[in-house]
Amino acid sequence: MAGVVLVSISNPNFHSAAAQEMAAAKAPSADPDRTHIDEVLKGLNRGHSVGQVEVSPDGKRMAWLQSGKDGAEIRVAPLDDLAKSERVTAAAKADQHCHEGQMVWAPDAQALAFFSDCARPGEQADLYVARLDGSPAQRLSKLNGYVEQPAFSPDGRSVAFLYVEGATRSAGALAAMKPWSGVIGEDGVEIQRVALVTVPANGSAEDTTAPAGKTLNSLFSFATPANLHVYEFDWRPDSRGLAYVAADPPGENNWWVAKLYTQEMGGKPNAILAPAEVSGALHGLQIAVPRWSPDGKAIAFIGGLMSDQGSTGGDVWIVSAEGGQPVDLTPQRPTSAAWMEWAGNEHLYVSELAGGNCQLIRLHLEGDKASQDVTTTFGSPVFSIPGAVGDGRMELSLSSSADHSIFVFRASTFDHPAEVYEAKPGTVMSAGLEGVIQLTHQNDGVEPAWGKSVSLEWKSDGFHVQGWLMLPKDYDPAKRYPLIVEVHGGPAAAVVAHWGGGGGLSATAFSALGYFVLQPNPRGSYGQGEEFTQANRKDFGYGDLRDILVGVDTVLAKYPVDADRVGLTGWSYGGFMSMFAVTQTQRFKAAVAGAGISDWQSYYGENSIDQWMVPYFGASVYDDPAAYAKASAITFIKQAKTPTLVVVGDRDGECPAPQSFEFWHALRAEHVPTQLVVYPNEGHAFADPAHRRDVMVRAVEWFSRYLGAGS
């Protein structure tokens, strides 16, 4: 397609005669019809999407993002009658459509704060507050940069949010990196800080005297210093301070060594916890989701081995607000906590991944929570759903009323499109979606375009491993089918059942086109506890690959899969696994490696996030190069025989394009069928829908060529 750089070894003059014969023997079918693939991809996201959902603090109303032909809009309605919804917007006219979202309720439930670009369409989002008395929304800022995570102060007088002034890109390592220029690491570093806007009682908030392009109006201020990059924050209960996770710039690289800070408004930051310096199980790990206890004495957070900011999993920890030794509240629990919030001073509600289920539990604290004497007990799950849940803010986050009698969230599975649900702690609920109250029915009657899915479990090296198997659409047990193994990124992440697909490497698309698809959660994944997540340290490509291969054997033993037609794919860490596995085994007859890593030694000096590697490899590449060579596909490239398609974005900072070039070049030198496709102006997470579609089309064509088409 236009704009895509395609590098191929399809020139027959390049191959030796033997290599050409081998390639021909492995090609059981011609490329499939692209028109048919397009039709399948278009049908994957049928139904209406559900955006962010927020229940009001008094539990009487709900705000949500509703998709429409002109984008998403904010709707508000009584929780017991969502049909009576009204639009909340900064638009001056009813027919004006803006990009709006990230709404948050005021503590008194009488107003919503949200971001909107109505004042500068397509250019800049500003903060607005809309009172629910019918008066127009107030614009409270004149910003110039990237914004996210608004949060009202507990007293309702201010809204804080994360802000990158003068940003040229979204914050984080997933977005396309800026072209390298100037003094690297010093020039043009973009720093995310907590900004603060005062909410006026009435009247216009815009300061028309502010210089053009500046954010200095009478209501705006920065709460955190310019020498700290802030990732997450939480208000102190008295509204006079913050707790936040932050690190020295550059922010993309240093999240893995971030510290927990507290700060009085107008004061200086105080680092109360540095995982690199503490002793015990938290040493050298990562922290996320800081939550201040209602009495202000302690801060709870999630700590664990995490490979990516925003992909949170670990144990629930607590530390005194004055600092000191942290306490693990959930040691040896066989789950991965992802989000939590306090319910009084003695309880925490925790959203966690348990095997293939997302569930909400209540954690009871006994003793002095600001000391080492605190103990915990667990209640039965409020709900446990074999699917994806969340309120649209962060992974597994939920929206609750102030008294925590109601939790509202969206949920979907491989079989059910997203709807909004309600859970009430203390009520008797069964497992699955049947155990919660469905509030919306906008997708009633919508059926999946792909096959049935099942949760598989198996044993590998003493570990209990879970994964998802998608059957081909219109599955016939009398037929034999090809199998595609899709390995997730991370590695600290997990495949959770969810609706939709169609962009990038999509399991639902492969299933819709007639393939079995195995999505394993091998050691290193979330869902089985912190010991399981840490089980691949200094072992990339070995124990986790064994888990995957045992999963393949489990599928072969139970389903009519042709063992000679098994393919492998994945993105990020899954891209690494796709590169490495084909140097370790000949079981895969074709592979598609997306944004992978082929040489950990060269990667260490190329990427924008090298801080993540030391917790996994135990030392830097300069101190222990052998540990990095052991996990590198390039080390074993002479053993690679599998035809492999390689795809990557040219501005990927997490898994830079040179890693894909290096692997492609090595395969080409070894006369292994390969092709490299580079997508312009793309980072680690592709932004252009046309590029995401193109990746999927090429992957289907590659697998069809070497595995044969699905049913």
Residue ranges of predicted features:
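A short helix->beta-strand "capping" segment at the edge of beta-propeller domains
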Residues: 27-50, 210-222
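Hydrophobic beta-strand positions that form the internal "hydrophobic ladder"
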Residues: 62, 109-113, 156-159, 242-243, ...
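Residue-level detector of Asp-centered blade-edge/turn motifs that repeat once per structural unit
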Residues: 57-58, 107-108, 154-155, 237-238, ...
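Serine-hydrolase catalytic core recognition
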Residues: 345, 390-711
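Short loop/turn segments that connect beta-strands within beta-propeller blades
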Residues: 78-82, 131-135, 199-203, 264-268, ...
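A flexible loop/linker signature enriched in serine peptidases of the S9 family
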Residues: 47, 66-75, 92-100, 113-128, ...
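Beta-strand-rich domains and repeat architectures in extracellular enzymes and scaffolds
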Residues: 40-75
